[in-house]
C-alpha cells in the first residue's frame, strides 16, 4: 500500500511547497491547518491536496508525519496525540535534510532575499535542466528524476543545520529573529556552522563583512560590485523597465543580463544566480534568456492596479528589507508619491529595531502603520505600540485600523506599498474594496 504523507501545518510556506513537491512525485499527500485563509493554500487546492482542520483523528500510525516547526504538544492536538501514542514524526527541516540527498542540491541562505533568489534560480535552472525546487512562497515542483534540487535554507533556530547541499548561495548576514539570536555574532556563528556543511561551493555576497569572515572546506566564490569579487557586475543600468548589467568572472566577461526587476538587491540576486549557473557549466545565453522572463515570487513586490492606483504587496518585515522594497518602488515610479503601509511583525523585533524601522520608513513620502502583529510564540508586555513607532518617523505618519482605512484615500497618484509578515493583506484587501466603492460612487 502506498505510504501517505500527512503535513501538520500544511499552509506554512515551506510545508506547502514540500507537500506540492511530493504530490507531483506521485505520493499520497494530505495536511491539516487552521481554517483561516492563507495565500499558500491556493496551490494546494488547485493540485487537489486534501486540506483538513487540526484533529487527532487525522493521525494514523502508518502515516509518515511531517510537522511544521512552530507546533508543539501544548499548541497542537495532533502533536500531542502523536507523542501520547508513540507515533514518530519528523520536523520539516529534518525531513528536507534527508530528501535532498537524492539530488545535486543547491541551497539559498541569507537573512534577506532568500525567497526571491530561490525563485529566480529555480526559474532559470528548471528552464534549462530538469530541476526540482522548493520556494519559500509556497511554490514547489517535484520530479524524482531531476538532476538538481533548489531550495530555501532558513537560519531561524538554526533550521538549516540538517542540510548538507553540494552548493549554497549566501545573500547576506544580518541580525534578525531577536527572540532566538542573541546578536550578529550569534547569527554569523550559525552561518559558519552551515558553511561547514557545504560540499562543493559557496556563493556569497562579497560586500558583507560577516560573510567575508567565513571559512569552509568548499571553495567560496564572492559576488558583488567590487574589484575583489570573483563574480562582478559592471555597467549597471537601472530604469523604470528594470535593470541590466554585464557579468564578469575573475576579469573575464561571461555575459550581458537584463532583469525585469527593481532595486539594487535584485541585481545582486541575479548575479548570484548567474554565478551558480556559470559554475555548473550551464550556457550563459540560456541563463540570460530565462532571467529576462522571471516574473517574481509571491508576496515579493507583487503589483496590481485598482483603476489608476498602484498597489504593491511585499513580505518585507525587517528594516533592511523595507529599505530595499522602497528603493525598488522609487526606481519603477520615480515621479509618484510613495505611500508606505507597514505592519510591524512581532513585539520583540519591533522593540529591537524601532529606531531602524523609523529611519528606513522615512524613505517613503508618507507612512501608515497597522497595529503590531504578535507572534504565537510571544506575549505582549505593552512595551511598544504602533503609535510609538509612528512618533519616531520624521515623515507624516499615522496609525490606521482595519475597520477604517479611509485615510489612505488622501493621496492622488500614490503608489501604495503594503509591507509585513502578519495579516497586512487584510488591510490591503480593505483598501481595494474602498477604492472600488469610491470609484462606483463617482460614476
Curated annotation (Swiss-Prot):
Q: What does this protein do?
A: Cell wall formation.
- Which UniProt keywords are listed? ATP-binding, Cell cycle, Cell division, Cell shape, Cell wall biogenesis/degradation, Cytoplasm, Ligase, Nucleotide-binding, Peptidoglycan synthesis
- Listed Pfam families: Mur_ligase, Mur_ligase_C, Mur_ligase_M
Q: Which SUPFAM superfamilies match?
A: MurCD N-terminal domain, MurD-like peptide ligases, catalytic domain, MurD-like peptide ligases, peptide-binding domain
Query: Where in the cell is the protein located?
Result: Cytoplasm
> Which GO MF terms does the UniProt record name?
ATP binding; UDP-N-acetylmuramate-L-alanine ligase activity
Per the UniProt record, the source organism is Lactococcus lactis subsp. cremoris (strain MG1363)
Q: Which family does it belong to?
A: Belongs to the MurCDEF family.
Protein name, as recorded: UDP-N-acetylmuramate--L-alanine ligase
Reaction(s) catalysed by this chain's protein: UDP-N-acetyl-alpha-D-muramate + L-alanine + ATP = UDP-N-acetyl-alpha-D-muramoyl-L-alanine + ADP + phosphate + H(+)
Top class in the EC scheme: ligase
Q: In which pathway does it act?
A: Cell wall biogenesis; peptidoglycan biosynthesis
- Gene that codes for this? murC
Q: What is its EC number?
A: 6.3.2.8
The primary site where this protein sits is cytoplasm
